[in-house]
């Protein structure tokens, strides 16, 4: 797993909408983005690791679905999280 508890808690605290918020769309997208960054770096050095590449594609698809949901429900929150994380769409 790419994220240790301290890093995960830091991300949750940064993107949480409330005090006990750990599962909002923004938090999920931020956590997925960190895992995607980790796997991208991993695959730069381990080019033949096809199982990790498949996992990366699944994570990207999950993040895309969450971002689509957020865009359809609350466009302002979508713009905020997109700009904060540097995601294209």
From Swiss-Prot:
Entries under InterPro entries matching the protein: Ribosomal_uS15, Ribosomal_uS15_bac-type, uS15_NS1_RNA-bd_sf
Assigned protein family: Belongs to the universal ribosomal protein uS15 family.
Keywords: Ribonucleoprotein, Ribosomal protein, RNA-binding, rRNA-binding
Name of the featured protein: Small ribosomal subunit protein uS15
Function: One of the primary rRNA binding proteins, it binds directly to 16S rRNA where it helps nucleate assembly of the platform of the 30S subunit by binding and bridging several RNA helices of the 16S rRNA.
SUPFAM superfamilies cross-referenced by the UniProt entry: S15/NS1 RNA-binding domain (SSF47060)
GO cellular-component term (any): cytosolic small ribosomal subunit
Subunit structure: Part of the 30S ribosomal subunit. Forms a bridge to the 50S subunit in the 70S ribosome, contacting the 23S rRNA.
Organism: Sulfurovum sp. (strain NBC37-1)
Gene Ontology MF annotations: rRNA binding; structural constituent of ribosome
Classification via Pfam families: Ribosomal_S15
SMART domains: Ribosomal_S15 (SM01387)
PANTHER family for the chain: RIBOSOMAL PROTEIN S15, BACTERIAL AND ORGANELLAR (PTHR23321), SMALL RIBOSOMAL SUBUNIT PROTEIN US15M (PTHR23321:SF26)
Primary gene name: rpsO
Gene Ontology biological process terms, A to Z: translation
């Amino acid at each position: 797993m790419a994220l240790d508890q301290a890093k995960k808690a830091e991300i949750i605290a940064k993107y949480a909408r409330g005090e006990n918020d750990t599962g909002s769309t923004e938090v999920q997208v931020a956590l997925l983005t960190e895992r995607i960054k980790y796997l991208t770096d991993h695959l730069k050095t381990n080019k033949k690791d096809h199982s990790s590449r498949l996992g990366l594609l699944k994570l990207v698809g999950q993040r895309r679905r969450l971002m689509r949901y957020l865009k359809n429900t609350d466009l302002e929150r979508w713009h905020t999280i997109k700009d904060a994380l540097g995601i294209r769409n």
